[in-house]
Amino acid sequence: MRSAAKPWNPAIRAGGHGPDRVRPLPAASSGMKSSKSSTSLAFESRLSRLKRASSEDTLNKPGSTAASGVVRLKKTATAGAISELTESRLRSGTGAFTTTKRTGIPAPREFSVTVSRERSVPRGPSNPRKSVSSPTSSNTPTPTKHLRTPSTKPKQENEGGEKAALESQVRELLAEAKAKDSEINRLRSELKKYKEKRTLNAEGTDALGPNVDGTSVSPGDTEPMIRALEEKNKNFQKELSDLEEENRVLKEKLIYLEHSPNSEGAASHTGDSSCPTSITQESSFGSPTGNQMSSDIDEYKKNIHGNALRTSGSSSSDVTKASLSPDASDFEHITAETPSRPLSSTSNPFKSSKCSTAGSSPNSVSELSLASLTEKIQKMEENHHSTAEELQATLQELSDQQQMVQELTAENEKLVDEKTILETSFHQHRERAEQLSQENEKLMNLLQERVKNEEPTTQEGKIIELEQKCTGILEQGRFEREKLLNIQQQLTCSLRKVEEENQGALEMIKRLKEENEKLNEFLELERHNNNMMAKTLEECRVTLEGLKMENGSLKSHLQGEKQKATEASAVEQTAESCEVQEMLKVARAEKDLLELSCNELRQELLKANGEIKHVSSLLAKVEKDYSYLKEICDHQAEQLSRTSLKLQEKASESDAEIKDMKETIFELEDQVEQHRAVKLHNNQLISELESSVIKLEEQKSDLERQLKTLTKQMKEETEEWRRFQADLQTAVVVANDIKCEAQQELRTVKRKLLEEEEKNARLQKELGDVQGHGRVVTSRAAPPPVDEEPESSEVDAAGRWPGVCVSRTSPTPPESATTVKSLIKSFDLGRPGGAGQNISVHKTPRSPLSGIPVRTAPAAAVSPMQRHSTYSSVRPASRGVTQRLDLPDLPLSDILKGRTETLKPDPHLRKSPSLESLSRPPSLGFGDTRLLSASTRAWKPQSKLSVERKDPLAALAREYGGSKRNALLKWCQKKTQGYANIDITNFSSSWSDGLAFCALLHTYLPAHIPYQELNSQEKKRNLLLAFEAAESVGIKPSLELSEMLYTDRPDWQSVMQYVAQIYKYFET
């Protein structure tokens, strides 16, 4: 991808940026108003040269023009869809959401018009796709100058139309789904009404018998209704097929949007160069990497139709609420000019960069701007992933809704079939009734003919006997009926009498109790009055006695006064006669008064005595009445107690009978419930088995597909291995020829050497005879110049065979010859052990093949995914060869395990987007984890309707609004509010460090998780704590620890499923 970034360097150098020009980019409006500088003219000339080069490439390659046009169309559609969706979300968030509601749902033809317009755009020479999009479409501060070309405005208009069309298409699909739901409910209600009418008509015909056939509903009346229903069903199926087609097109577009090669190109460009601007489409197509990308796009488009439904996944959701509203999505966090695909979270674009800002020094960008850029890029990446995740969730919910619609249509078809079955059975019963009526008429005719043929006397006798028997039976039946009716009436009368007597006795008891209470009160009152009278009588007696005593004392006093008066009269008759007479008169008057008062008191005493006698007589009468009434009450109370005991016994018996009946009713209800439960269980087992069979078939098809790909890969690798074997065979043959020639030359050299030695010995003998001891020493130093010939021959041999190192030592040992022979034999026989021997031959220093420049094993016998790992790891090449060659002998699980082991990312490798996409395990779709999860999920019921009814996430979605994914996300945010280092925005990267799991479980299980001691760097500890805490309360771990540890973005569907398990356990 560096070659794609190089054409931009001269244009950037022409600007001459320095460290003092690092500033945020100006707005788009100011860029339009500003005049073109010399740098922009140079940039446009460079761009025109690139356009001409790319047009020549496309003309030279006619097969790739259609593919590139389709790719450009796809890129415009998908990039336009993302930016338009984000712009509409931002506009609706600021208050213009009512305008989108007011406009309504556009017709589907608007989308076709925009697509045709977009398709016609790339044909012209001024293609808006060839404009520079990165400097003008990013609001992030970049070190490059704000450049603008005149063709950006029509491009933005085209993209805006495409985006608006996509959004309106989604809204139209949602509205049509709602309309179809209402139509399905209406059809169901009509079917129910029709069924009720038919059952009522069938009951009427059964009750009236065969004589009332004329009153039943004729099949001619039901035929127009059936036809109307069939026409509605056909129209409904047509509309469903149209909706499915539109849904499929949208799915393809959205999936292509998620995996768009434009985003991959932008990510790789930002990964290789430190400039965080995206590469234009034309530069990617003009460079060799662009052509490579176009071929990859074609392969992806071929495979996308098979994998569209598999990538979307399956999650039960409420599609009517999974709308793209601003509060239920993450589009509001993204600006309209973000790049289409950011970098991965693990690859920092400034850590592995090998070029600084083009045309400037490496210190031109400050650390603050770098940090802000990395933060913004990471934010944009998070927002992009969350939007992709939400789009996948909406796709899944749309597919679920579509499946529900299909199930409803299937139910409708079943109801239609049942209706036809009922109609056929009705017609059969009607025909059967007609046949029976005809047979009855025949039998009646036969009976009449037989009666006519018989004699009249016997006929009359039989008739009389039959009449007598019939009258006897009728009288007996009437008598028994009357008897039973009489018994029933007697029982009812006796029961009523007993009830009336019981009620009368109860009323009598109440009255007697009330009278008794009244008499007791009267008696108490009389006693109280009697006591009062007795007290007044006693007081009167006391006063009377006092008066008597006073009277006696007065009498005695009077007598004394009389005596004194007589004495005084006798003594003082003369002097005081007048005074005495006056005193006597006063005393007499007092005496008269006292006598009058005494008479009054006596009369009062007589009256009190009379009243006392009257009160005593009344008291006696009241006591007699009380004793009489008491006896009557006791007698009646005894009678009532007896009757109440009898009634209580009867009531207890009736209660016992009622209890027995209730127990029997409960037992029967339990049996009915048990039968229903058994039936439901059997139905569930049947549905589960059907779903498991369907899933097993899907797994079988997936495995067959993967097996085909593996066999294809095996064939390619075997062909490559054969080619390598052929090359190696030729190299071995050449080496053997060289070896044979070298051995022959060695033999000739040895013969010459022996001959020279013999000559030397003879000469030495002659010299020894002639000369002395000193000459012998000089003759012994003579062989080296003689040995120059073998050396020269060896040099000649080396010159004739360049690249071959001939050993100066003794001939090669027999081991090397045997290894070469065994290697050739293994090639001839096709043994897989030759690869290891080949590598051992290259490693041995004494082998004659060590100098031959033969292609090494990793380049030929290792798969392309292993080549990436062989550059940095020290893994031996024989391991990959033996693994791949021994595949047929291993079971499938071992093959998959070995494949996932070989595809693990190397930690020493620098992470680039291409390597990361290659080494990411979920991209395979063929690992042990996926097989295990598929096997665990293979026994779940397939019906989306039953899942929708039992799913607690539907209630959560109704509570929070929006889709199930967004509702669960909001619930997690609400539960983890207040926890440090927790920011949940999606179901992939927000959960990778395990802190979100720990915080969520800490709200329910604080004793299991010490949250204050946790750290985001210790991923393994966090995940183990969370999984163990969840498993301790019964939540099964559905996530793989290895996948969570080695990937920064785990599968969001499995994470969402695990969080949904936590929600179901603690909240439902």
UniProtKB/Swiss-Prot annotation:
Expressing tissues? Highly expressed in testis. Barely detectable in other tissues. Also highly expressed in some cancer cell lines.
Compositional bias of kind Polar residues? 261-295, 309-323, 337-367, 866-875
The answer to whether keyword Secreted applies is no
Q: Which SMART domains match?
A: CH
Q: Which CDD domains match?
A: CH_CYTSB
Record's subcellular location: Nucleus
User: Matching Pfam families, A to Z?
Assistant: CH (PF00307)
Q: Calponin-homology (CH) domain location, by residue?
A: 962-1067
Q: Which residues form a coiled coil?
A: 579-773
Bias regions of kind Basic and acidic residues — which residues? Answer: 154-200, 898-909
Family listed? Belongs to the cytospin-A family.
**PANTHER family to which the protein is assigned, alphabetical:** CALPONIN HOMOLOGY DOMAIN-CONTAINING PROTEIN DDB_G0272472-RELATED, CYTOSPIN-B
What's the protein called, per UniProt? Cytospin-B
Q: What is the originating organism of this protein?
A: Homo sapiens (Human)
Q: Which gene encodes it?
A: SPECC1
